[in-house]
């Protein structure tokens, strides 16, 4: 079973937070092949390889891993959903919608959105908005949860019900 962790990781908190989420998932599922884009040095060692890391190289490396995964965990926090994360959600769900539209069966897959911001339950000025098209895509093929524990529970249920 393969999973893909889509997050923003270009600042200290994003990088360290992503590493902590990945660690929790790996502890819960040691047999799972978890791809975390920030760990792919071939496309992310910008200090030493910035001149050879291209947008196409990043796209090919990450898209290959994304499309071969059965589980997408998408981190949704931030003022906006990170553009890369939204693109990864779109590609993953789009591949499923295409197979569905042409009547082809596919390996079961799930999208789990992780949205931890406490303001999501606020009202008025205290409410945090997320794009409803993106949330709808997630909810059509999975759901949005608020904690890493809930992510792990959903992953456990999915892996139990759809072993590869």
Residue ranges and their predicted role:
Residues 1-164:
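Conserved catalytic or regulatory cores that recognize and/or transform ribose-phosphate-containing ligands
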